[in-house]
Amino acid sequence: MKAEIMAIGTEILLGDIVNTNAQFLAKELANLGIGVYHQSVVGDNSERILEAFDNAFKNCDTIITTGGLGPTKDDLSKELAAKYFNMEMCLREELLCDLEDYFKKNNLEMTENNKKQCYFPKEAIILPNPNGTAPGAILEGENNKRIILLPGPPREMEPMFTNHVVPYLSKFTDSVLVSKILRVFGIGESKMEDLVCDLLDNENPTVAPYAKNIDVILRITAKGKNKEEAEKLISPMEKEIRKRLGDNIYGEGEVTLEEVVGKLLVDKKMTVSTAESCTGGMVASTLINYPGISEVFMEGAVTYSNEAKMKRLGVKKETLEDFGAVSEECAREMAKGIAKNAGTRIGISTTGIAGPGGGTEEKPVGLVYAGLCIDGITKVKKFNFKADRQKVRTRTMMNVLDWLRRELEKID
């Protein structure tokens, strides 16, 4: 089976709404072992939608549409799908009863145009929608071609697909695709690809690197008769990749770096405080996203001015005069100072020039120093980021968290 995902709606075509449905459907179809070779977006235009059906069926046997099932005149999906397969629309009385009950239960007035949502070809397989008013449907045409019509809102589409479409599609597949994602930080996509380049030509499982924000993911995908068989194919490949990338791999699946660091801090009972200048509280804010971090996170200080660095953190006036606020020496004293004053085992500091102004030849925009004081031992790292102000700050925060992760993993 080959499928195309087709979003129908001018609002998506113009970028007014982000098409998150396509990502969800692509992942779910991959899990079923169904190949998706094309995705398309079509506006609310009859001629163009019919043309899109024609083009899609040149390459696939299954079209999955989202959107265009509502009560308004520009909701055209099911009418055009029926026309494409030469099916006649008719009022489905059972759907009308369900719709009237929905409006009564929610104490809403049902306008006449809502009945439009109850018209489907008599041949259609109806997909119930307990989360909204527009049912979905499956229309099966000749030559093993089918159009699966799903509503546009994700909160309606996703459960409909999971509860009704997945069991239907499972009848047509004799294999499954299983993927495992390894999340990587500390090396760029090109460097990582160089380390695993010989593995990228493998066919089953396949290995593919993707840059995502400022970390990188490696997706290992295997096809098997069942999930267990596919996982057995993935296992030796994963071991080889972990051997090559080592502690640059920080997690699996959808886990974030902040979750990994938060868990390490809580599990190891390592109290922490932050003193930030150029990042303006981003490190602290990211850490406290982790549930339960209040057990170990004591304090976050934004010490932007030299005065605040001296008064709040105990940075020496001579240090600022001799080396400046953006220096290894200042970052060191900031990390030690916040750990001491907050009474925490870990103190983190950041100081740098985020831009766009303020840089010099000696200290350019993007120069950042970060300090990490753990149980009285202080280390400093120097970074040079070539990016705009927000990216300099974000990259600083991410690199500091990754550095902290690596240090925490060394502690028993």
Curated annotation (Swiss-Prot):
Transmembrane segments: none annotated. InterPro entries: CinA (IPR050101), CinA-like_C (IPR036653), CinA_C (IPR008136), CinA_KH (IPR041424), Competence-induced_CinA (IPR008135), MoaB/Mog-like_dom_sf (IPR036425), MoaB/Mog_dom (IPR001453). SMART domains: MoCF_biosynth. Gene3D superfamilies: 3.30.70.2860, CinA-like, MoaB/Mog-like domain. HAMAP family: CinA_B. NCBIfam families: cinA_nterm (TIGR00200), molyb_syn (TIGR00177), PncC_domain (TIGR00199), PRK00549.1 (NF001813). Belongs to the CinA family. PANTHER family: NICOTINAMIDE-NUCLEOTIDE AMIDOHYDROLASE PNCC (PTHR13939), NMN AMIDOHYDROLASE-LIKE PROTEIN YFAY (PTHR13939:SF0). This is Putative competence-damage inducible protein. It comes from Clostridium perfringens (strain ATCC 13124 / DSM 756 / JCM 1290 / NCIMB 6125 / NCTC 8237 / Type A). The gene is cinA.
